[in-house]
Every structure is written in C-alpha cells, then in structure tokens.
Amino acid sequence: MTNIRKTHPLMKIINHSFIDLPTPSNISAWWNFGSLLGACLGIQIITGLFLAMHYTSDTATAFSSVTHICRDVNYGWLIRYMHANGASMFFICLFLHVGRGVYYGSYSYTETWNIGIILLFTVMATAFMGYVLPWGQMSFWGATVITNLLSAIPYIGTTLVEWIWGGFSVDKATLTRFFAFHFILPFIIAALVMVHLLFLHETGSNNPSGLNSDSDKIPFHPYFTIKDFLGLLLLISILMSLVLFSPDLLGDPDNYTPANPLSTPPHIKPEWYFLFAYAILRSIPNKLGGVLALVFSILILAILPLLQFSKQRSMMFRPLSQCLFWILTADLLTLTWIGGQPVEHPFIIIGQLASILYFSIILILFPMFSLLENKLLKW
C-alpha cells in the first residue's frame, strides 16, 4: 500500500514541499532563514492575535489599553514584548535572507525574487502601521512624518495624504484604519509566502556554488528539517533573551509618553530596521527626490538580475565582488547609524556620502567588477 502522504491530496502538497522535496546537498546555514522567517511570521500572527483581543484602536484608550495588557493581562507583558521584539528578529532574518540572495545570485530566479521584493515592501508597511498602534509620541509623530511624505507626489499628493489620514491630521480615523490594515496584512503576507514557495519549487533551491545541483539532491526530511530546527532553537533563544532581559533595548523611550500633537519630540525617527532608508531619505534636500530615493533604495533590488554581467552566478569564487559586497554591508550599517542621529554636521555629509556609495556600488561598481572578473578569468 502506498504511503498516505503520497496519495492524500492535502498531504501530497505538504509531502512535496517539506518532506520529499529534492534539496541541494551543499546548502549552508544561510539557507535557514526562509524557515526562520516562516517561524517569525507564525510568532507574530499568534502574539498579535492575543494582543488584538485586549487592544482598543481609539485615540483616547489605545495607550492605556497597551499599558493594561502589560500590567493586568496574564503574561500580557510577555506577549507584547515578544510581538515588538519578534518584529526586530523578523527584519534581522529578512535582511540576512536578502543579503544571501544577493551574494549567491539567487535573484536569477526572477519570479521568486520579485515576489520576495513585494513581500519585503508588505512586511515594511505592516511593521510601520504596527508601530503607530501603541499611540505613544514616536507612534504619532512617526505616522505624521512618514505619511506626509506622500504629499510630495505631484498634483494628487495633498489629497492622497488627507485621504489616508481620514481627516486633516493623524487622528482617530487614522489609528482605526491602521489597526485594520495591520491585522489583515500578515494574512496577505502568508498568502504571498505560498506564492514565493510555489515559484521557488518550480526551479528548486540555489546553492552556494551557484552551479546546477540536479546530480546531487537529497530529501528535505530528515536532513534539513533537523537543520532548520537547530536554527529555530537559536532564533527562539535570541528572541527570548531579548524579551526577558532587555525588552526595551531596540525601542524608543519617547513611545512611553502618550501621543501629544502639541509637543514635537526633539528627534523623530522610525524603528531601527527602517533607519537605513530614513538616512537615504534625509540625505536629499528635495522632498520628492528624497521620497524617490527612499523607494528606489529597496526597489533597486528588482533590477539586480539585469545588472548580472558575471559568467558565474554566485560570488563564492569572485573575490573582487565579495569585497564590494562587504563594503555595501558596512555602508548599510553606516546608514542605519546615521538614520538615528540628529540632522547636523558631520552626520549630514556622512549620510550623503553613504547614500551615494550605496547606489554607486549596486548600479556601477557591481557590473564593472563582474566584467573585470570575467576578463581576469579570460571568459
């Protein structure tokens, strides 16, 4: 008798995706982040559901309802901080996952890559709206500043901003709709993840060498299920250490002050995972130019397949491109640091130079170095 997992319509899908999936035998720990992102999404949806049971999306009570969750709900503090720090873990895994894709040339799978970029934008939108919900000072002013950027769009800008706000400023209507969107988007993300995996399983996984691995595939279970489980243990260990020892390490103290439209905080800044894009936005003096630079700082990932001039897919055997990749990583860390600093000398010029370097590396230096490496290898 054939095994039920190979015949039952539902079990068959699970079997082909997680059990009998042919996987390259040489994929490293950098390939763990997909499953870790799935785990993060699961944690966020579960903790978020329990938070939503006690949260009220009204400007008068939102801040107090979060305080109530932390003080009066059983393990409410744990759920709240797991959700807040879970978002940070989510973005750490996302950045490493995207970085892996760039390093090993996984962007050659264009459908998977483009769905991934849509996922990145959706997760960023969800995180931004989630940050507004506690209705602290940084929530209110962050929402005001970021939504206001849309007013830079010619002709329809102002109307668009007021339409999003549901009035003439960030208020009750804005908070209510942000809560509604923040609740629904993770389920849309889950659906997009299915599409992401669907396209990935059409081609099979890439591997560190960037070569075709059809001749050396092994079943996903038990080899990679056990490997993913180790990654999951590490993820949960780091997350719980953060939650239980220093839950406010990555947060902003200003968000413990209830939102006050009459008092502007000295430094308005988003959560740490948006700081690199925020630094790029601030480094351009023109409003529309800044908004375009902000969008293109992530959308630039979509043109990576067009900038691939190397005869080798992966950077594993390309020392010049490797060097450039790590300079880009350092540059992104610099931008993250600058995004959290006040707008004054020398931070302004450092931010501008780091922004120029970011776009130059991706648009000019990567293609140049690829061609140079081809020449050095007489290809």
UniProtKB/Swiss-Prot annotation:
One GO molecular function term? Answer: metal ion binding
**Residues binding a ubiquinone, per UniProt:** 201
User: Quaternary structure per UniProt?
Assistant: The cytochrome bc1 complex contains 11 subunits: 3 respiratory subunits (MT-CYB, CYC1 and UQCRFS1), 2 core proteins (UQCRC1 and UQCRC2) and 6 low-molecular weight proteins (UQCRH/QCR6, UQCRB/QCR7, UQCRQ/QCR8, UQCR10/QCR9, UQCR11/QCR10 and a cleavage product of UQCRFS1). This cytochrome bc1 complex then forms a dimer.
The cofactors required by this protein are: heme b
Q: How is the cofactor bound?
A: Binds 2 heme b groups non-covalently.
Q: List the keywords (alphabetical).
A: Electron transport, Heme, Iron, Membrane, Metal-binding, Mitochondrion, Mitochondrion inner membrane, Respiratory chain, Transmembrane, Transmembrane helix, Transport, Ubiquinone
Which InterPro entries is this protein grouped with? Answer: Cyt_b/b6_C, Cyt_b/b6_C_sf, Cyt_b/b6_N, Cytb/b6-like_sf, Cytochrome_b, Cytochrome_b_C_euk/bac, Cytochrome_b_N_euk/bac, Di-haem_cyt_TM
What name does UniProt use for this protein? Cytochrome b
The answer, when asked if ATP-binding is one of the entry's keywords, is no
Which protein family is named in the record? Belongs to the cytochrome b family.
The membrane-topology field of this record reads: Multi-pass membrane protein
What gene, per UniProt, encodes this protein?
Answer: MT-CYB
Which residues are heme b b562-binding? Answer: 83, 182
Task: Report the protein's function.
Answer: Component of the ubiquinol-cytochrome c reductase complex (complex III or cytochrome b-c1 complex) that is part of the mitochondrial respiratory chain. The b-c1 complex mediates electron transfer from ubiquinol to cytochrome c. Contributes to the generation of a proton gradient across the mitochondrial membrane that is then used for ATP synthesis.
State where it is primarily located. mitochondrion
Q: What other note does the entry give for this protein? A: Heme 1 (or BL or b562) is low-potential and absorbs at about 562 nm, and heme 2 (or BH or b566) is high-potential and absorbs at about 566 nm.
Read off the PANTHER family from this record. CYTOCHROME B
Q: Which SUPFAM superfamilies match?
A: a domain/subunit of cytochrome bc1 complex (Ubiquinol-cytochrome c reductase), Transmembrane di-heme cytochromes
Gene Ontology cellular-component terms listed: mitochondrial inner membrane; respiratory chain complex III
Give the GO biological process terms. mitochondrial electron transport, ubiquinol to cytochrome c
Binding of heme b b566 occurs at: 97, 196
Q: Where in the cell is it found?
A: Mitochondrion inner membrane
What residues form the membrane-spanning segments?
33-53, 77-98, 113-133, 178-198, 226-246, 288-308, 320-340, 347-367
Organism of this sequence: Dryomys nitedula
